[in-house]
């Protein structure tokens, strides 16, 4: 009997756990460490920072079954889902990972053992083919000489994508960074299915199916294309759960595995469909998986970003339900069957089942109201069509009026061999966005909606004041011709010395003035290629076309420049002190402070903070020149300029250098020489997220002010200790030592008092069938002393049951002690639990000693009074 999909998933994880791998839970479908990624689409996503050296784990081997979505963005399988045997919007990627631990030999041997081992998947060895990168002789020899695969089933794949290292068998994270060859394992379904082995002209057939990709990360690709060997090569593998399930269950399509058969039957039941081969059943069975898990991971249907992708998938499923003849809302009814077939992987979904069902039901109900009318309109338009392309305006009208995502319209059209003018659709969509921005109403962020034709020339690198002309005015996000005194507005100039917020540096403040008017600028922002001066007209009136004198607040700008230059010095210093894994994750540079977020997986030690401070100040004392050059992006990278991971840059970039110490891409304003900074002080270091630290620092006058403040605090402390700041450390140590001595003496006194109290209490014990019972509430006794007292009393009383209680700050503390010879009849944990329940608490412990707490002090006397009857019944 073949394994179920759930059993296959578990077997994979169990196998690698037996090989020393940490079983790591699937991460969210919403990536939390990669803003460039729409959805988690591979098992390695959650380990990306580990492979990049930006994060460390307490394990060097890991295995996962990762939930993935490919629907939107670069990896978009949506239009193929339901029409092919192996495309899905949602799938599970089984993977094993080595972070500088094992490499090619073990990775290949592990894969072979799992696939062919009698106790594991037991696949026929003669059905397995492998590919290796053309020059990867090491992997080839492992497969041939150690595993024993015949040469005719080992295929070398070269650069088959038109460039060096552009190959199906060479994996790259990006243009630079970790990369390396990979070996892929294929399963031969047999000659009754059309297709040829990988690398052959017939490789696109369904006979030979890739089931496992094993990536060997052994190089670090540089900006100039050179490959540097990684000091600790790693392994990243991926095997689609649905694909291996199809192989192990002896079927040729993923949609024929047990998981999908069950879901397809559930879809047929809720839609009333009878033909189980209908492709719409496949579409819906696939889509319920992606939709349910996306909602469980916090995505909700909307018209933007991830929410819009979710909406598109839901509406595509609803439309296919309509094609099947569904008469009422059906999609949400599939969440329960989905949970049932997912096994342990569906536990989180089960916890959120009600919410997921409600979101799906609401979205389906909203779309159902317009679906039939929209389909009728589309049928009408297609009937009138003379060519083979539906115009973009009609596609947009279906979206705007009836809520049809363009890919849903394209789905309907494709079934009739008709294309959609998607460029025309996008043009109509952009026009609608423009109208929406202009007509924006109450409660909106008006300034964010401003769109300006034309550009402003920024001249603030060399000027802090210059003359310009007003090219546009905006009030509440709307273009106006003029403004009057008291009005808040955004003023756009043809040229300006004002720096618009960018790259972490805040926008400039200052004043625009001219004949009879003055405009106070409180912020400066970019609007496309234009620069907007945000503020209030203090006096007079201002209109488009007026000449103005633009004056930047030069003292504020000067402080910002110092902080920005210090940020660059600190970034370079952090990389020297902590390591080159340090990369900027965010920054804020204003006139008061600089804040810098960076990748590092532990809190900085005081010695490291001091070392960074000292190194930055050393560069300040060197008085290095701060120079800028405009050059091609690739030339800048070749020069060693640091670029931010995931940041987008133009082809021509501004490179800022500080002597031989720091080179970065930056468009901000800076000091002329590092000596201008004067002094650099770190005021705090903290964590903001996993693997991300934050430093706040001050420079110049701000740094001097912190020194004065610290000196004042030391003087205050010295006065309190009746000493001076020179010997403050010695004085504090003396006070702490004296405090420790006093605390020790106090503890001894408390213990003596407790012993005396115990002696007094022992006389109050009552005899119940040969067992001494002592129940007492003690005033003024610390809760932690109760245990000592119980131990003393047990020694004094012999066969005994003891319950002591005290109240401190309104909270009840309880302890029960039972001598060993009585625990077969009276359990301390049960006893203290009975009392705690009456005072609004709970607790437990061993049969001979147990503790509890409560919040209802008023109920304590009655609770203690109940002990005698409870114990008597047990004895």
Curated annotation (Swiss-Prot):
Consists of three domains; the N-terminal catalytic domain, the editing domain and the C-terminal C-Ala domain. The editing domain removes incorrectly charged amino acids, while the C-Ala domain, along with tRNA(Ala), serves as a bridge to cooperatively bring together the editing and aminoacylation centers thus stimulating deacylation of misacylated tRNAs. Its cofactor is Zn(2+). InterPro entries: aa-tRNA-synth_II/BPL/LPL, Ala-tRNA-lgiase_IIc, Ala-tRNA-ligase_IIc_anticod-bd, Ala-tRNA-synth_IIc_core, Ala-tRNA-synth_IIc_N, Ala-tRNA_ligase, Ala_tRNA_ligase_euk/bac, DHHA1_dom. GO terms for biological process: alanyl-tRNA aminoacylation; negative regulation of DNA-templated transcription. Homotetramer. Keywords: Aminoacyl-tRNA synthetase, ATP-binding, Cytoplasm, Ligase, Metal-binding, Nucleotide-binding, Protein biosynthesis, RNA-binding, tRNA-binding, Zinc. The gene is alaS. GO terms for cellular component: cytosol. GO terms for molecular function: alanine-tRNA ligase activity; aminoacyl-tRNA deacylase activity; ATP binding; tRNA binding; zinc ion binding. It is found in: Cytoplasm. Catalyzes the attachment of alanine to tRNA(Ala) in a two-step reaction: alanine is first activated by ATP to form Ala-AMP and then transferred to the acceptor end of tRNA(Ala). Also edits incorrectly charged Ser-tRNA(Ala) and Gly-tRNA(Ala) via its editing domain. This is Alanine--tRNA ligase. Zn(2+) binds at residues 564, 568, 666, 670. Belongs to the class-II aminoacyl-tRNA synthetase family. It comes from the Bacteria. Binds 1 zinc ion per subunit. Its main location: cytoplasm. Transmembrane segments: none annotated. Its EC number is 6.1.1.7. It catalyses: tRNA(Ala) + L-alanine + ATP = L-alanyl-tRNA(Ala) + AMP + diphosphate. It holds the Pfam family tRNA-synt_2c. The keyword Hydrolase does not apply.
